[in-house]
């Protein structure tokens, strides 16, 4: 065996053999044939260890989520290791994370697998450990992460792009590399077969790695990485994407939370406010008591009706799409990582919010969702609900063009609409090209405003320079806001930790607020400090600029007249529509029903829409027995296959006193999706025998069929749910 890393192995040494394998896999028919090919490949490359031993992690690197720095040839010896070379700004790297999370759920370090994130920064701001910490928290990364700020391992292995996954054997030997996103099946196949291969040879160790999650040290906060903010100009309310808490907040001007929708955990569910869920939402837009949300990691556009207190999906199918054309009805059209939204008009004579513009970061494009039938520049008539590409080829570029489909964006992340003449355009914060661009609402032409470089393939032209046009330099801007009164554009220059202002007439770009340090200070514009601000919006008739100061977990308020910065004191309101509860407590999950639980079928009951049916528990304990004090005796409602029946219901409750048992009220929805349904009441009781010599957990399931009629029958008598344990 060669000394660890002695030969300076690189991915190029794997390329011929892995390329041959992947061609052979294309010709294989059955899964067994494919598995055998991978197994044979491993037999081949396993003998090349002297040439393909990776270099050790350099000493002195900063680590996250571990108790101490890790060594490939000590701590990781005996493990199959997946190295994820990533940079936290990159949307493609973000797209890989769900695959890694799924792999971690399937195989743990006890099984012999460990994932290590190797953070190799693109932008200077991303080399700073505190900023990587924020990203680790924001994206719920729970595996070890090393800050390879100088890209030492990247260069040693000749990694060429983000993301790149490198799979190592238990002796630090290179096995596979996967470049880019979209390789989930190969990742699972290669990893599982490698684990089996080395387990058969007795080379896998099941020892645990010392994991210390950074997120466990995070103090509670009303906001967690707020991404975007919008103002309801009719009422002055703020809408905040509380991204890290996976929820949307409606906040009064004084900071009191009026409504909290979703959270605290990620999910993908439509319905009433109390049951709906989001996954790292970003962009928000509000008009006429309706909020549109870029539900980024669900790859959806959601609609929040504040009057009906209901959430629905209006675009996307819930999985990442690769379509770069679109044209399907919204909820049938796959989309990819929408990052911001803006309400606007299709250009009809009547100015109305009939289009939702979408910054589609995942496909590097600008899309449109038709909220009413209309037309887009260079498009024929489009029907209501159509979700379609407006500008951008789908290639990650900084390419301007008079033809919108030939232009190229690089992870567009912020939108602002200037519908008035002479502008009539969308301003776009194009984060990976470090530019602000414009898209004409008249003909779709894409033009440069500030930042970046002339070469459309150069995505590394970033900096922090005030100037005009291409002489101005930004670093990964994420947000823009149009000031109609002053006719200027505000820019969240995120990785420079500044708010800048652009005059579109002169293309002049100057710093408005922020010292440039990643810090937190509320003072004058010149002395204030931000930490990766991600979104901003104009309020109070142009007097205030609200800023989502993402890594400071705050909404900052910039007074454009007094030129001061303050913090909005976000706090819970006693009259909030939904308790936001910082974060909201987890809803109870239904415990597993004991095998001994009785299942009782009840005779059908006839009910009508809108009726309240009373279900009364009548449970009897054995003689002398009593409920176990402090144990969670409880009931739950279930309606498998008919979940619509439980909307707006109280889904569970406690049983605290056997002599005063709860009555469960089942409100039949006014709009029923079926004329027959079954609701189950699941009961769990914890009780002790008379002499307290034994305590037990028992269960019973009552199954109540419902026959729903449109004619109003006589009021149904309460249903008794009787059972003796």
Curated annotation (Swiss-Prot):
Its domain of life reads Eukaryota
Pfam families the record matches: NHL, Thioredoxin_8
Supply the alphabetized keyword list. Answer: Cytoplasm, Repeat
Name which cysteines form disulfide bonds: none
- Where do the record's region annotations for Disordered lie? 319-338
What does the record say about the knockout? Full embryonic lethality. No homozygous embryos are present at 2.5 dpc.
An example Gene Ontology CC term for this record: cytosol
List localization entries. Answer: Cytoplasm, Cytosol
The organs and tissues expressing this protein are described as: Ubiquitous.
NHL repeat positions in this chain? 212-254, 265-307, 335-369, 409-439, 461-505, 517-561
Q: Which SUPFAM superfamilies match?
A: NHL repeat, Thioredoxin-like
What are the Thioredoxin domain coordinates in residue numbering? 48-196
> Where does the sequence pass through the membrane?
none
Which InterPro entries does the record cross-reference, listed alphabetically?
A: 6-blade_b-propeller_TolB-like (IPR011042), NHL2_NHL_rpt_dom (IPR045302), NHL_repeat (IPR001258), Thioredoxin-like_fold (IPR012336), Thioredoxin-like_sf (IPR036249), Thioredoxin_domain (IPR013766)
> Which PROSITE patterns does its entry note?
THIOREDOXIN_2
PANTHER family according to UniProt: NHL REPEAT-CONTAINING PROTEIN 2 (PTHR46388:SF2)
**Known role:** Required for normal embryonic development.
Subunit info? Monomer.
What protein name applies here?
NHL repeat-containing protein 2
């Amino acid at each position: 065996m060669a000394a660890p890393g002695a030969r300076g192995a690189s991915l190029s040494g794997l390329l011929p053999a892995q390329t041959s394998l992947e061609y052979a896999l294309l010709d294989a028919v059955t899964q067994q044939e494919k598995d055998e090919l991978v197994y044979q490949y491993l037999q081949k490359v396993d003998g090349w260890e002297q040439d393909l031993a990776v270099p050790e992690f350099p000493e002195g690197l900063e680590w996250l989520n571990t108790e101490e720095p890790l060594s490939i040839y000590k701590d990781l010896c005996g493990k199959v290791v997946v190295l994820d070379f990533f940079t936290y700004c990159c949307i493609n790297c973000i797209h890989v994370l769900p695959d890694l999370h799924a792999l971690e759920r399937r195989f743990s370090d006890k099984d012999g697998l460990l994932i290590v994130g190797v953070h190799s920064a693109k932008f200077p701001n991303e080399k700073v450990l505190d900023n990587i910490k924020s990203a680790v928290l924001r994206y719920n990364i729970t595996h070890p992460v090393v800050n390879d700020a100088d890209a030492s391992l990247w260069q040693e292995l000749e990694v060429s792009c983000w993301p790149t996954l490198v799979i190592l054997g238990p002796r630090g030997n290179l096995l596979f590399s996967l470049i880019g996103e979209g390789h989930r099946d190969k990742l699972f196949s290669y990893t599982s077969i490698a684990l089996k291969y080395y387990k058969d040879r007795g080379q896998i160790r099941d020892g645990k790695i010392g994991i210390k999650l950074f997120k466990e040290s995070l103090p509670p906060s009303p906001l967690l990485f707020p991404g975007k903010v919008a103002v309801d100009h009719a009422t002055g309310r703020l809408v905040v994407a509380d991204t890290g808490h996976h929820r949307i907040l409606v906040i009064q001007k004084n900071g009191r939370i009026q409504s909290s929708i979703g959270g605290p955990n990620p999910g993908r569910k439509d319905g009433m406010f109390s049951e709906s869920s989001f996954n790292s939402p970003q962009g928000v837009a509000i008009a006429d008591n309706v909020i549109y949300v870029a539900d980024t990691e669900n790859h959806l556009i959601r609609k929040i009706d504040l009057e009906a207190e209901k959430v629905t999906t209006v675009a996307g199918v819930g999985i990442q799409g690769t379509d770069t054309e679109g044209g399907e009805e919204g909820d049938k059209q796959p989309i990819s990582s929408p990052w911001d939204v803006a309400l606007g008009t299709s250009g009809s004579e009547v100015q109305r919010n009939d289009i939702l513009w979408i910054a589609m970061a995942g496909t590097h494009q600008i899309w449109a969702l038709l909220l009413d039938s209309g037309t887009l520049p260079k498009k024929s008539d489009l029907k209501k609900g159509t979700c379609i590409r407006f500008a951008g080829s789908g290639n990650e570029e900084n390419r301007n063009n008079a033809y919108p489909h030939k232009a190229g964006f690089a992870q567009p992340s912020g939108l602002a609409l200037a519908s008035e003449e002479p502008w009539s355009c969308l301003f776009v914060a194009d984060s990976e090209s470090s530019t602000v661009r414009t898209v004409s609402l008249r003909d779709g032409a894409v033009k440069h405003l500030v930042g970046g470089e002339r070469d459309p393939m150069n995505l590394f032209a970033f900096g922090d320079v005030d100037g005009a046009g291409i002489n101005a330099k930004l670093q990964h801007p994420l947000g823009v806001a149009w000031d109609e009164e002053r006719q200027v554009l505000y820019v969240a220059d995120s990785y420079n930790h500044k708010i800048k202002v652009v005059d579109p007439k002169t293309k002049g770009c100057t710093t408005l607020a922020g010292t440039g340090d990643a810090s937190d200070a509320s003072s004058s514009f010149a002395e204030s400090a931000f930490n990766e601000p991600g979104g901003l919006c104009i309020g109070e008739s142009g007097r205030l600029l609200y800023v989502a100061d993402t890594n400071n977990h705050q909404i900052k308020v910039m007074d454009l007249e007094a030129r001061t910065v303050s913090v909005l004191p976000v706090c819970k309101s006693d009259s909030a529509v939904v308790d936001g509860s910082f974060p909201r407590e987890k809803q109870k999950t239904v415990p597993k029903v004991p095998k001994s639980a009785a299942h009782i079928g009840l005779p059908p009951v006839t009910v009508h829409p809108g009726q309240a049916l009373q279900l009364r528990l009548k449970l009897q304990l054995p003689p002398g027995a009593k409920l176990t004090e402090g144990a969670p005796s409880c009931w739950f409602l279930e309606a498998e296959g008919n979940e619509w029946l439980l909307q707006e219901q109280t889904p569970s409750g406690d049983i605290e006193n056997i002599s005063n048992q709860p009555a469960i009220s089942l409100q039949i929805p006014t709009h029923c999706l079926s004329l027959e349904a079954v609701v189950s009441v699941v009961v769990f009781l914890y009780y002790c025998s008379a002499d307290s010599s034994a305590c037990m957990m028992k269960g019973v399931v009552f199954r109540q069929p419902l026959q729903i009629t449109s004619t109003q029958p006589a009021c149904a008598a309460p249903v008794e749910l009787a059972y003796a344990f």
